[in-house]
């Protein structure tokens, strides 16, 4: 073996561990078929496709291929309120899928929420799909560890999300770890450099540890990511036509609220520059901001999703909007799922919740 071969053997790359697709339906668009075929052959893969590109049908077809090939079910994990939506999508395309809340695994594809993973055994499944996989980084270490440990016991794995950020290296690391490639700390140590000269001293000073790509490692790093993931913002990224996927412009309207009171001990308000001042300003103006939002929501009669960040905001909005339902962190998983589904299905006109609770999949 020469030196070049020796170095090549040390190159990080996700090996193929899948199979040739056994079913490729006509309802998939050309770029979707390309991604699904690659993911099936890969065996353990991530599809980072932007909003509106059809991740759900791609994930269902991938899962159906694994189930048909192995004769065993595939577990399809989703955030709260997305499970029922996924089953409806499967029914629309004639794919056998059931929703399970108690660990039953009798279906071709078994759809369940991440929060119910403890009801299932990895030994019962040939494959697992993690929908909205960006949610992994929002889970606490124990929950994320449970999901990763479960996936490692299953031979075929697929991650899907529209929000994977190429500059969020931790997210790429947790995705790689869940798929069975490099763990996120192994990834950081191999490809990145800690910006603090002494991380222990930095932590003592309260500094946040930052990582940056080593200069010589940038190309190998992205080659490694491309060996197990595909990131697509539009079909033309893969050489296909964009015509059917041109989304309308997103309109953002900003509304200014005049504070009705001054900070304690102040003759006039000052700009809230620091985080402490911003938090105080948000708490001081809860009443004014909620009143403005409620006025707009009540005047339209249209479905509305209202994001809040403080419990006081959520409670105030719920009181000001008569037909609103609120999903809060203290609610049980069943209650959260019930209310999120009620909004998604049109049974509740207004939903009030925090982004960290309901942003995934709505």
PLM segments and residue spans:
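Conserved pre-motif I regulatory segment
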Residues: 7-48
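Conserved P-loop NTPase motor "coupling/switch" region that bridges the ATPase
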Residues: 72-73, 127, 135, 144-236
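Conserved helix/coil segment N-terminal to the catalytic DExD/H
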Residues: 102-127
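Conserved interdomain hinge at the start of the Helicase C-terminal
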Residues: 277-309, 316
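Conserved helicase ATPase core of P-loop NTP-dependent helicases/translocases
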Residues: 305-307, 314-318, 322-358
């Amino acid at each position: 073996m020469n030196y070049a071969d020796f170095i090549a053997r040390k190159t990080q790359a996700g090996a193929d561990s899948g199979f040739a697709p056994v079913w490729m339906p006509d309802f998939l668009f050309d770029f979707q078929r390309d991604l699904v075929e690659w993911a099936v052959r890969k065996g353990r893969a991530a599809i980072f496709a932007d909003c509106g590109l059809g991740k759900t049908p791609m994930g269902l077809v991938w899962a159906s291929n694994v189930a048909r090939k192995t004769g065993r079910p595939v577990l399809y994990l989703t955030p709260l309120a997305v499970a029922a939506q996924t089953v409806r999508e499967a029914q629309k395309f004639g794919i056998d899928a059931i929703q399970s809340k108690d660990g039953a695994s009798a279906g071709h594809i078994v759809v369940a929420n991440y929060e119910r993973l403890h009801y299932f055994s990895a030994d019962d499944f040939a494959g697992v799909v993690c929908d909205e996989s960006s949610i992994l980084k929002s889970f606490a270490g124990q929950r994320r560890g449970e999901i990763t440990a479960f996936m490692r016991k299953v031979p075929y794995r697929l991650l899907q999300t529209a929000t994977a950020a190429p500059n969020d290296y931790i997210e790429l690391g947790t995705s790689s770890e869940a798929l069975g490639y490099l763990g996120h700390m192994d990834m950081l140590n191999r490809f990145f450099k800690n910006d603090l000269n002494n991380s222990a001293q930095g932590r003592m000073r309260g500094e946040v540890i930052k990582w940056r790509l080593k200069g010589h490692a940038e190309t190998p790093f992205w080659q490694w990511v491309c060996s197990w993931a595909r990131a697509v913002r539009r079909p033309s990224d893969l050489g296909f036509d964009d015509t059917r996927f041109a989304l309308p412009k997103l309109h953002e309207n900003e509304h200014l609220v005049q504070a009705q009171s001054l900070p304690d001990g102040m003759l006039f308000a000052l700009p809230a520059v620091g985080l402490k001042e911003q938090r105080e300003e948000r708490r001081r103006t809860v009443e004014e901001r909620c009143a403005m939002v409620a006025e707009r929501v009540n005047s339209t009669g249209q479905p509305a999703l209202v994001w809040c960040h403080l419990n006081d905001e959520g409670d105030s909005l719920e009181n000001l909007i008569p037909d609103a339902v609120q999903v809060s962190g203290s609610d049980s998983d069943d209650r959260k799922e019930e209310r999120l589904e009620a909004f998604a299905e049109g049974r509740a006109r207004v939903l009030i919740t925090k982004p960290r609770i309901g942003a995934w999949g709505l």
